[in-house]
Amino acid sequence: MLNPIILFLAIIFDRIIGELPESIHPTVWIGKLIAFLENIFKSTNCKNKYRDFLFGSLTTFITLLVVGVIAFFVDKCIMLLPFPLNYIIYGFLLSTTIGYKSLFEFCKKPIEYIKNGDLEGARKAVQHIVSRDASKLDKEHVLSAAVESLSENITDSIIGALFYAIFFGLPGAFVYRAINTLDAMIGYKNEKYLWYGKLAARLDDIANFIPSRIAGILLIITAPFYKGDVKKAIYGFLKEANKVPSPNSGYTMATLANALNITLEKIGYYKLGSGKIDVEKSLNAFKAVDYTVVVFLIIYTLIWWIT
């Protein structure tokens, strides 16, 4: 298992540096590879679902193979370097698979606009992080959308990559990020991608199955630290997670909504928790994420030390 020092370094690098420029960001390179392959294996828009599934699966397989092989060799080369240089470089590269700082930046913007009384600015800001039409959302639903995005991405942006890095090093983290990117680019249930992106979407569900539930449990454990209600958090985890169409996102969304005693609602799709959402409670959600990450690292460090 990966030395916890590397995980701490990855978090520190991400929180200080944030996202790298697009020209040198590995996730952007992965996206370009996916787009290149998609241009070769074009979708037929469901006119031939078997062809779409085959070529979409090839796109997925080739992407994961290329990313995994490169990450494997980079991993081995780094570990040939002397300590502490190897740990520093390893931690830096691992940080590129994490979106901790950028997640906070994007999700806080709408809340800050609401705090300053600028509803229109908040709508525009939240539109960057959700797919629903935000142009007519009221204050509560803007706040809800921001916290939904934050809670949903605890797994995708932070815990998931760390989880796979622990067991599989850089290859695990980068393959996980590639799966997320594939799902984000071709994992849609529309005419073009229904069959072409089916494998990518299923792999994303599988990859997030364990990390999402770990994140949900950690939100329960850390609830007292962010003024959350433990009993309600447990209720959300056990009883409301399945209200969300995603098989994984609900475990963090429902747990956090109930812990903070707020309502997270995507009109016409789901309604989680109860109680009125406001700026203060919305900002508490960021504390919840911080405590979740810290406790995750502490627990893993103890396990690593004992074993």
UniProtKB/Swiss-Prot annotation:
Entry GO MF terms: ABC-type vitamin B12 transporter activity; threonine-phosphate decarboxylase activity
Stretches that traverse the bilayer: 53-73, 78-98, 156-176, 206-226, 286-306
SS bond partners: none
GO terms under biological process: cobalamin biosynthetic process
Short name of one Pfam family: CobD_Cbib
Pathway involvement of the protein, from the record: Cofactor biosynthesis; adenosylcobalamin biosynthesis
Membrane protein topology class: Multi-pass membrane protein
Compartments reported by the entry: Cell membrane
GO CC annotation terms, alphabetical: plasma membrane
Highest taxon above the source species: Archaea
Alphabetical UniProt keywords: Cell membrane, Cobalamin biosynthesis, Membrane, Transmembrane, Transmembrane helix
PANTHER family attached to this UniProt entry: COBALAMIN BIOSYNTHESIS PROTEIN CBIB (PTHR34308:SF1)
Job of this protein: Converts cobyric acid to cobinamide by the addition of aminopropanol on the F carboxylic group.
Recorded family membership: Belongs to the CobD/CbiB family.
NCBIfam families documented for this protein: cobal_cbiB, PRK01209.2-5
Record protein name field: Probable cobalamin biosynthesis protein CobD
Organism this protein belongs to: Methanocaldococcus jannaschii (strain ATCC 43067 / DSM 2661 / JAL-1 / JCM 10045 / NBRC 100440)
Gene that this sequence comes from: cobD
